[in-house]
Amino acid sequence: MIQMSKKVSVSLMALVLLAMTATAGTNLAKSAKTSGVKWNPVMDAIIQVESEGNPRAVSGNSVGAMQITPILVKDCNEILKKQKSKKRYTMDDRYSVAKSKEMFLLIQSYYNRENSIEKAIRSWNGGVKYSVRATNRYYKKVMALMK
């Protein structure tokens, strides 16, 4: 009887861990929704500016609909590691619009805790330490597409 209850306990723990792992990606989307910011229009506008919606777009080291660089993938994986998540992104994930949006949301949740749309747009173009002057044109393009 004790062995049976141990097996049941181990099985239940495994199921709970599986459920937690499976929802890791959706937690980002949920937290983005609960923050009060509707990120989809921002991401969709960025996609139009970056690649005109082409998930196969390539420009130097940047690829995919959101033109993600290897450095950004590495940064996302470092954030996930700090969060003790087992999830990791690959270079091929940059070609997936859904995974690219997940990476965008992860970056925003880490570097843009105030959920500033302006900061999100400018930092996507100019990096975390962006220059307002250098990102003005990009910011205006994205904002124009959101209206």
PLM segments and residue spans:
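Bacterial N-terminal signal peptides that target proteins for export
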Residues: 2-12
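Bacterial N-terminal signal peptides
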Residues: 11-19
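Catalytic glycan-binding domains that act on GlcNAc-containing polysaccharides
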Residues: 25-147
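Sec/Tat signal peptide C-region and signal peptidase I cleavage site
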Residues: 20-24
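N-terminal amphipathic/basic-hydrophobic helices that include classical n-h-c signal peptides
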Residues: 1-2, 121
